[in-house]
């Protein structure tokens, strides 16, 4: 069974939006992350303060191939490949809305999380109705 995750995409480190739009995927570090192929990963965009993308883990132990979108030197260890499933452009996934469904923000999303079932179910339902 696939798990759902929420991950924090930091604009100052990488231009994830551009990579997803141009490549159709991004690479995500395997360090301290336990994704499995088939898992769903929602991306909270640091600059927009909202969840904007639904991605799916399609491979692991991949070389980093999105280096052109990085603003800092990324670690070059193996990565997961997260393929774009859908972009959300509405306002139901803004930070203020997410807080109403259990989002803690701040340091709680330094590493991907999957244990907030209420929040992840809400995010998934918004993508499904869009």
Place the predicted regions along the sequence by residue:
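Short, basic/aromatic beta-hairpin or loop at an interaction surface
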Residues: 8-23
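Short, surface-exposed beta-edge/turn micro-motifs
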Residues: 2-4, 37-41, 50
């Amino acid at each position: 069974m696939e798990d759902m995750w929420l991950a924090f995409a930091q604009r100052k480190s990488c231009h994830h939006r551009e990579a997803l739009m141009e490549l159709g995927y991004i690479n995500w570090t395997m360090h301290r992350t336990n994704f499995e192929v088939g898992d769903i990963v929602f991306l909270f965009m640091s600059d927009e303060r909202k969840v904007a993308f639904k991605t799916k883990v399609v491979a692991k132990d991949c070389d980093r191939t999105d280096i052109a979108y990085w603003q800092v030197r990324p670690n070059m260890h193996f990565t997961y490949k997260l393929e774009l499933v859908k972009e959300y452009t509405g306002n139901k996934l803004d930070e203020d809305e997410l807080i109403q469904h259990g989002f803690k923000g701040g340091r709680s999303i330094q590493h991907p999380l999957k244990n907030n079932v209420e929040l992840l179910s809400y995010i998934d339902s918004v993508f499904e109705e869009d």
